[in-house]
Amino acid sequence: MAAGDRVTVINRGSSPPPPGTIHLVADRNDENSLEKALGSRTFDVVVDQVCYTPRQAEIARRVFAVRTRRYVMTSTVEVYEYEDSAQLVREDAVNPRTVAVDLELPWDDPEFLDTHYGEGKRQAEAVFAADPGFPYVTVRVAHVLGGDDDFTGRLDHYAERIRAGEAIAVPATNHPATYIHVEEIADFLMWAAGEEFTGPVNAASHGVLTTGELCEALTEHLPGGRTMFQAVFRAVEVGEFSPFSFARSYGMDNARATRLGFSFGKAREWLPHAVTETLGAKVN
């Protein structure tokens, strides 16, 4: 909008759109509802922030195929959840054209969807990739940090345990991961919307962060800092890990996006600011 673009927000009406936008109310899971809300509108670019399943992707592909010249879907680093690589993972490690799609899985079951988040995104990517004429981009987003409205509570999880002296559950071999700041991914999506490339692209700041480095940044933010607090880790079995701890190594290589022209920041440089943004005065 700051650049003079007209922005249309489509949601179910449960939350108000930003001021100055055009607001359409529709259920994206209902193809007729979406078609009716859109009418004859067309768009230069569609940015899909809430596509979690292949069923949703099928509907979106049919509805927007004749309505947009570019479709940008926010995907996730979790499409690589089965990788375990000593090197940062490139986009070709998961080729959406080779991913099997199963529309009969219980994608409408919230519990199933929660435990199959990465699989849902993989199959959604595959639906878009199956149509060679559909101009899609899937932005595989690293773990996001920063901002004052983190509804996940993942950094709070660590801060509370550090303050209480409670052990933090991690895998016996705990791998580092790639991250991106919330403002950086917003900039990336805006950049991707205006480019011409297609297909999957990784979005991650330069460098990896360990669970220990996250905890060190949190400790520095606590009153008294490292002189009063220290993170304690406890190795546990699969299924009990704390957030941002990983038994497999699948940090993302950002070389493709860099070659295409996007300039990433360095995770270690923005991490202290991200901690301050998210925790604010809550730890005082």
Q: What positions do the PLM features span?
A:
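NAD(P)H-binding glycine-rich loop region in Rossmannoid oxidoreductase-like domains
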Residues: 13-68, 73, 79-82
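Mid/C-terminal beta-alpha module of Rossmann-like enzyme folds, strongest
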Residues: 188-242, 283
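Amphipathic terminal alpha-helices
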Residues: 265-284
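Glycine-rich "substrate-gating" loop/helix at the edge of Rossmann-like oxidoreductase active sites
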Residues: 114, 142-152, 172-183
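Alpha-helical substrate-binding/gating segment
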Residues: 159-169, 175-209
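Conserved beta-loop-beta element that borders a ligand/cofactor-binding pocket
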Residues: 122-148
